[in-house]
Amino acid sequence: MTDWTDPDALDLSDGETFDSLLDRADTREKGHFFEFFAEGDELAHDPGLRLSHHGSEQWMGQTLNHDPAYWRADTAQERGFEERPVHPDYLLACVMGITVEDLSEKGGYFLGRDDVEFHQPATAGTPLSVTSTVVDTRTSSSRPKYGIVTWETEGRDRETGETLVSYRRTNMIPRREPAATDGGAVGEQDEGGPAMPDTLLSPDGERFGDFQAALDTAREENAAVAYRHERGRTMDDQLVAGLPLSTLNTARQHHNRDEMADSPSGDIVAYGDVTRSIALAHARSDEATYREQRFADERFHDFVTLGDTVYGFTRVLDCDPDAGPERAGAVTFEHVAFNQEQTPVYSGRRTAHIQRHQ
């Protein structure tokens, strides 16, 4: 009888022998299929990532987020922070990255995120504790090999229990067994919204008063406050693979080119939060941001792959002079990221406090 624990029992340098072994070996799977999730399930995510200035600065530098409040202690104190915080985009990406292994590592489509709220600033050295609750599961009539799952996720300070950020996200998740389907559409067909006005206005500056004045003028002239941002950022290996891995995001679509070769994208794709952060960086470069507040109706419309360039477009929806601290007012924006083919790849609504004129 052969002792298969003997290191010399198999010649693994023989390609034919190794191929035969691979064909016969079981694969230890990672992640969960759609059938694993049931409404009401609560999942505690194990990875204990600790926020760091290095991670935050790496994220900001790569995505063009240059707000000095997240780089310098003096500016942070001027903005009312007790100490220099990590960037909220980095915080959100870390919290979501931790959840991927349990929720969406099997792949599928990131359909969107809603009700994103930052409850308080997060600082370097904070250990994260992340939990998710399944709030809805349903079949997909258009894609029987997938189901649709929605989770509510909270990221907390592991030591104090205080909630830092929360959100709701929805993904298509592969099914272990395809569902029976009539092949019908998922919902009603989009009949299109109202046409945009002929006139598009841009604010004259980056302060709250500039946005409010532009919006007031637009309402009087039946126009819209909407504009493009000049900067673009081309997706490279660091953005597509490096940043997701640094947040413990194990989704294969961001770093396994072999796995993705036969996928609809044909290559590894960018983490949605990287694309989002670049688009928001373009917008923030044209405003005097004081503090981020919340995000809603975030959608990811198309793949972003290596070599694609991400640009930004912004529409101003509302200005509230009474919301926020004395030195800032609240502005609600709609942001759209688009690629070099002018194809939208991300959209979302954002409310931020914007500094007033001093």
Swiss-Prot record:
Tell me, what controls this protein's activity? Shows highest activity at 0.5 M KCl. Does not require divalent ions for activity.
Q: Is the keyword Lyase assigned to this protein?
A: yes
| Recorded catalytic activity of this chain's protein | (2R,3S)-beta-methylmalyl-CoA = 2-methylfumaryl-CoA + H2O
Q: Under which EC number(s) is this enzyme classified?
A: 4.2.1.148
Q: What class of enzyme is it?
A: lyase
Q: Which GO terms describe its molecular function?
A: lyase activity
Q: Which UniProt keywords apply?
A: Lyase
Q: Which family does it belong to?
A: Belongs to the enoyl-CoA hydratase/isomerase family.
Role noted for this protein = Involved in the methylaspartate cycle. Catalyzes the reversible hydration of mesaconyl-CoA (2-methylfumaryl-CoA) to yield beta-methylmalyl-CoA ((2R,3S)-beta-methylmalyl-CoA). Also shows activity with mesaconyl-C4-CoA (3-methylfumaryl-CoA), (S)-citramalyl-CoA and (S)-malyl-CoA.
Instruction: Spell out the protein name for this chain.
Output: Mesaconyl-CoA hydratase
Upper taxonomic classification of the species? Archaea, Methanobacteriati, Methanobacteriota, Stenosarchaea group, Halobacteria
